[in-house]
Each structure stands twice: as C-alpha cells, then as structure tokens.
Swiss-Prot record:
It comes from Cucumis sativus (Cucumber). The keyword Membrane applies. May be involved in the regulation of photosystem II. Belongs to the PsbP family. Coiled coil: none annotated. Its main location: plastid. SUPFAM superfamilies: Mog1p/PsbP-like. Keywords: Chloroplast, Membrane, Photosynthesis, Photosystem II, Plastid, Thylakoid, Transit peptide. GO terms for biological process: photosynthesis. GO terms for cellular component: chloroplast thylakoid membrane; extrinsic component of membrane; photosystem II oxygen evolving complex. Pfam families: PsbP. This is Oxygen-evolving enhancer protein 2, chloroplastic. The gene is PSBP.
Amino acid sequence: MASTSCFLHHHALTAAARSSSSPRQAALPKSPQLLVCRAQKQQPAQEEEGGVVSRRLALTVLIGAAALGSKVSPADAAYGEAANVFGKPKSNTDYLPYSGDGFKLSIPSKWNPSKEREFPGQVLRYEDNFDSNSNLSVIINPTDKKSIKDFGSPEEFLSKVDYLLGKQAYFGKTASEGGFDPDAVATANILEATASNVNGKDYYFVSVLTRTADGDEGGKHQLITATVNDGKLYICKAQAGDKRWFKGARKFVEGAASSFSVA
C-alpha cells in the first residue's frame, strides 16, 4: 500500500550566498518554503494485509473441506421447510412404527391401543383418541391359499371377507329411499380395487365407502390391505367416518393402510 509523505525545504537565494562575505549584508526576504511530496510504499502494512488475505484463504479452504466431509444430503430439507444442515434429518412424528408377528405398519401417533375385538383372528386394534370410528385392525387367519391371487380378483376377495364391512343389524321391510334398495339399510360401494407386488409378495388393496340408513357420520371410508404369507391371510383394515375423512383423518387412514407389509 502506497502512502504520501510531505517535507518542507528552505530554498536559499543564490544572491544571499554570494554576499555572505560582504561586511554589510542587505536585508533579505524570508526564504520561500518548497513543499515536496513523495509517494512511498509501506512495506510492513502490505505484508500485514497479505497475512490477512492468507488467513482468509486458509479459512475458506477449511470451510470447504468441512462441507465436503459432512456429507449433508439435500433431502434433509424438503421444499418449503427450513434446512437442517448441521443436524440429523427430521423424523416424521405423525406416525409410530409398529412391528407385530410377521407384519409391520405405521400407526398414527395420536391413536391409542384398544382391547375391543371385532373380528376373528384380530391381533391388533388402535383407534383415534377423539373418535373411535377412526381406527385400524390387523387380522391374521390360517389359509390354504398360496397367494392372495388365489382368492380371485380384489372384488372377489372382498366378497369373501365382507364381514369386515359390518353386517346390517336390521332385517325388515323398508321403502326404497335415500339411495338404498328396498329392505336394505346398509350399502357398500367399492371406490378403488388394485393389485400390486412388493418385494415379490402380492397384495390387494380395496377402498370401500359404506353407508347406513341412519346417516351416521355420512358413511365410513374403509381401506383394506391384504396378502398371504406362510399359510396365513394377513389383513389390515383402517377406517374413518366420512365427515372426519374430509377434516384430516384421510391422511392418517391412508398412511396406515399403505404402510402395511409382511416380513
């Protein structure tokens, strides 16, 4: 870095120097002052600045090396979420993992275990803290089938386990109204029926909307996931009332049903 230094020099007149030998010196005007400016390099300052630059460069290299060694995954922060660069990925607190006898699934974290047993072979039941109509069950029964496909199509399979949907309690004469057939007070509509293969295992998935004449909850959405493994028929049934289905329960019912799998 360059700096400017200024010095004052007294300039003596030549005539004054020549007359110094005279016995009588004439009064001379004051010598004019000459301002001289010189540009000089300040070597120590430059070296100090160079040291600062070197330290900054070294710090940059260290930060870059730390970033490469941290192995931060871009997936740690989803779109619209705050990045969690220096911590572990955030876990999903909406569900709790559950491992049972030969099966596993994710259970909504705000659902509690229930001792109620609705179906033969039922080994697990959880329900919503605030509404028991929102619940899930796991049923395991022996079977001579080798694959879920041996039951026929997903619709045919459902007809063989229709007890899962509930039986109508009233059997009498009724008029045809409200979309129900004569003498019928309950109905079931298949909304979706699919087959899939996961890790070499065949699964059936059926989504059903059941309604009763009393209009309770406007009906129930019942999701059934089923498969066969080691001579056993595994069924996971998750459901929610129609009103709560559209108020947020759908996410948890679908999440639980789709997470079900066998070992």
